[in-house]
């Protein structure tokens, strides 16, 4: 690989899976591996084969996929661990041993000399088996500097192809990382990787500092997954390199959001809304000043074009809303109120926001319809009937009958629960029509008790990036969820029609 490209070593399937609450099936690990390869990572750390038969089977299955990127396996500085990696038909081993005094004393109960010898033996064995070898001194940033240099020099002399510098408990800062990498470059003449944890929120900053100091590779995870506070986030690291430092990677940045969503879905770890690059709010605007600026020139309040990372910007009405933002939102639905009507709509939106209400597209359209004295949106999709079955030892199943422009369609699906099954059945029916994805689902109890009135809010998106929010309320959570989804679908369909009409008008003489 040309040195002008920074190497991306993705450890989502190993370190990322060590996130509390995450356990991936072999099938899901393969799905993520295929997506990571599509994204353009240079190396996938597929797992830690020695830990279990299931882990070994998953790594073997990933190795069988004939992916374009390199596939590595983790191994302690033990012959049996390295053998386990080879049993998976891998040609790349990432081997490690702890070198800090606290780890040596309390975990390994070894002397420095013993740890050094184990490191050398592991590298020599891996190379004798024809493997590509990357060596990590675990807890490197808390290891005595002179001893650390001695370890890395020794494994370099033993033949390791690369060394990796782990900031195992995220205890470093960029200045420390800078001096450390430069020190190590003075004793080894092989490529250096950096592996940072985010315990103090500095994982990405520390990784960038390492690259600036001469490292050529970073170990990262999708969505910053990992033990405790997680690892350096691939999407943040890559975009910072591209946009702030002018450094290249092989990553297809337009696939970052797609990859983030796939990993979030399969791991069950929700991405925080305000997370940089891939959080739901990263390209969302509610403030009137901001929406006005973005509509005039997106660079006023966006550092990058959202399409660079597979995103679309979106606007939301709220108590900070302004005339320009609300006007743009209504225009998506083909509504063009007069200036006086627009002022009244904005005033009513602000009143609702001041009362603490989260304003959906449905609320905005209801206000606009009232002020403009127009009927609501045409309901192109209506619920005719649906049935759900669930219980102990029963796979939740839903059958849904929809009327789409007065034609009847029926779909059935299974799910993790009755709501999941019902929403999947709706998506199955409407897939060819709109290819809708559920981006957000929120359930709130409006009243107390077991018969509480529940409110369901959803945000849906189609393949063209049209986004709509909707809500529904009722005593039955499943019915409310289904109705909210259908409301969202109708709004998407209306946006698509308006957009299509605009495109046709462009070519009308």
What is the predicted function of each stretch?
Residues 5-6, 12, 245-412, 450-453:
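A mid-to-C-terminal "edge-of-domain" accessory segment
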Residues 14, 49-51, 74-78, 98-100, ...:
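Active-site beta-loop-alpha junctions enriched in small/polar residues
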Residues 68, 104, 167, 220-227, ...:
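Short beta-alpha connecting loops at secondary-structure transitions
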Residues 172, 178-296:
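Catalytic alpha/beta core domains of metabolic enzymes, predominantly
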